[in-house]
Amino acid sequence: MAMPEEINRIACDQMSSILFAPTQTAIENLRKEGFMDIEVRFKYGKERQVFNSGDIMYDNSLYFAKFSGQTKILESNSLQANNYILATIHRDNNTDNPARLESIFRALLHISYEDKIDIILPLHPRTSKLMPKNLSPELYDKVVQSSLLKLIEPVSFLEMIELEKNAKLVITDSGGVQKEAFFFEKPCVILRPETEWVEIVAHGAGVITDA
């Protein structure tokens, strides 16, 4: 399994007696893992219960979206609402693999110039550190000199919400950003070979492209 956080989720599931699932798909996955079987439900001497609670991340995103405009992140980066692309790259299988990182940045440059659109990329410290090492010198120079591909410092939670809700498109390898793009009804390109949030792809709101 490539996603460490998914391993953590499974471990937490196994240790829990009450599970709150965000979707019906998640409940079905628990069923496939045997959580509805009698011997599993009463494994620790008391019934293990599963509830469809809805996704509290959705409530959280909508709540803070009311305040995100206070950040002025769009104005400070000369961005117009619904006229830019938000990108994030931080997963080690992308940042630590020169071929994958090169492919992603070549694609970002191509999209920005072909479509004449700004792409804003808040740089994760991991990505920032590895770009000079894992990008070819020629590509690295093009990236840092590009006027359309805007590399900026990491942003706050509210600033990220503001960038997500006003983007035309989101390109990301982040699980959380995928979901927030979905909540704000933004199409999402997923830079991973798989996603744990299968509902996003099933509803046609995201596409898995890998790198």
Where are these regions (language model features)?
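A conserved, positively charged/aromatic
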Residues: A2-S17, E164
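A donor-sugar binding/catalytic signature common to diverse glycosyltransferases
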Residues: M1, L19, M160-I200
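Short beta-strand scaffold positions
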Residues: A21, N52, P122, I171-T172
